[in-house]
Amino acid sequence: MKKNGTTSAGKTRYRCLDCGASRTIDRDGSQRRYQLEALVAWLCSNQTQAQVRPGQSARTFRAQTAWCWHVQPVIEPTGEVFDEVQLDGIYLQKDHCCLIAYANGHVVDFQWCTTENATAWRVLLERIPAPAVVIIDGGSGLAKALRTTWPDTKIQRCLVHIQRNVRRYLTRRPRTTPGRQLAKLNYALTKIQTLDEAADWLVALATWHSSHQAFLNQKTYATDPMATTPWWWTHDRVRKAYNLLATQARNGTLFQYLQTELLEQVHTPVSSTTNRIEGGVNAPLRQMLSLHRGMRLPRRKRAVEWWLQQHTEAPAPVHTFIQPQHYDPTARVTPITEEPIGPALYDRAFTDEEGIGIQRGWKGL
């Protein structure tokens, strides 16, 4: 066989040198591989569908890659033990959340769930060896899952998230003097670089509480006798802001990134925020979904899976996930329900036995 030009469809034509017969050869496997690679490349880029393949329309691209959405990528666990792992969840919409583990600049694993809870986090954590320290933003159920799955791992709360939550209670311009003093302590939280500065900050927080304890304990009593609550804290939002800082200080999750014992176990400085996973995973994922907006939820989830798989440390080739059932799915057969033969047991017709349909005589007698 020898190449003998191309057909009108662009396929290479082959001709037999002995008998002169001409034919084309279909390489279905390589074609499927090329189509899936094109889809993944489009998802991970800012190109439009018409720009992926020059000379090909967006409609043709969608038709050729329609089967590719059935292919589900999987991240195989490597068993590598990391010094630091950052955990966070991103919501595509209500009841559809993706839990993500991130370490050393790449995705480690992910898990789909309806909402962040201890069970969902535990499923993800059980597939990853326990690291020396984990950086979290305080998501629902995560602390409980860490206590049961990674009991020896140190926990560092994201200081930016704590600072943001405290500011939500105090606002940017607190009206009371204790509120302004607490806001000043809150702003200084992310600027601490040494253990001495951390100790001074904790002393300042304790001093603030002892100085304004009477202010925090002030109560307002209801004047309406029909009120459901007889009294409430007058400065409830300031109390909540202080309790948030005090709780994390008692738990020891504010300044783990400065502890000498932990720094001796790891090879790189420990992060004090979840900025790496926020900027390295969450922001690009939201940008991808914005660039390729308009997809239905199942395709958005598949797009997220492909992006995460492609940003692992050593992503497997995309064609290794292709199975025959992906591009040749079995046709769905709708079962035919036959009507039962015999008298109706329950129907809409009137019968004498019911007593509420046909009535005879005076007053039904």
Briefly describe each language-model feature range.
Residues 31-47:
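Short, amphipathic alpha-helical "recognition" segments used to contact nucleic acids or chromatin
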Residues 1, 17:
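Cys/His/Pro-rich metal-binding microdomains
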Residues 15, 22, 54-152:
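RNase H-like nuclease fold core
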Residues 13, 20, 24-28, 35, ...:
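Acidic/histidine-rich catalytic cores and adjacent linkers
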Residues 3-13:
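Short linker/helix segments within small regulatory modules
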Residues 91, 164, 281-282:
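Short hydrophobic/aromatic residue motifs in ordered secondary structure
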Residues 137-187:
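Conserved beta-strand -> loop -> alpha-helix junction used to position metal-binding or nucleic-acid-contacting
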Residues 48-55, 284:
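DNA-recognition alpha helix
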